């Protein structure tokens, strides 16, 4: 079982992620913005972060850069779950420290497959 933080300003997206991942045995922690996400990342050990790119307060690129400064986030996979599919934005995300990318709308089996590959240890 992995502990997964999902950071998205959309409660329905966070709920959808939870509905897909919890039955597979994962513990899903939710955050609605960058500040909540950072606080929850600092509060406990995480196996994976799934974040949106476009959020109201601060975008996902800034969140990834902040997470990558935390000693606890070294080597931790971070996946973007976003409507963006632009190659330039994907390269920016990779440079910031993103491990993977899933485009919304997503299929539950796609999310499970990506999570399964990244949290296997």
Residues of each region from the PLM?
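Active-site residues of response regulator receiver
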Residues: 52, 82
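Receiver (REC) domain active-site loop signature in two-component systems and cognate sites
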Residues: 55
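Short hydrophobic/Thr-rich beta-strand motif most characteristic of the beta2 strand and flanking loop
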Residues: 25-32, 40, 102
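C-terminal output helix
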Residues: 106-115
């Amino acid at each position: 079982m992995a502990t997964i933080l999902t950071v998205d300003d959309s409660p329905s997206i966070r709920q959808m992620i939870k509905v897909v991942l919890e039955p597979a045995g994962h513990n899903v922690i939710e955050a609605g913005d960058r500040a909540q996400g950072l606080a929850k990342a600092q509060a406990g050990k995480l196996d994976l972060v799934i974040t949106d790119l476009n959020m109201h307060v601060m975008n996902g690129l800034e969140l990834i850069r902040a997470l990558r400064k935390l000693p606890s986030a070294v080597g931790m996979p971070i996946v973007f779950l976003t409507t963006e599919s632009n190659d330039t934005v994907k390269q920016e995300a990779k440079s910031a420290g993103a491990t993977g990318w899933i485009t919304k709308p997503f299929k539950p089996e796609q999310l499970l497959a990506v999570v399964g590959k990244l949290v296997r240890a």
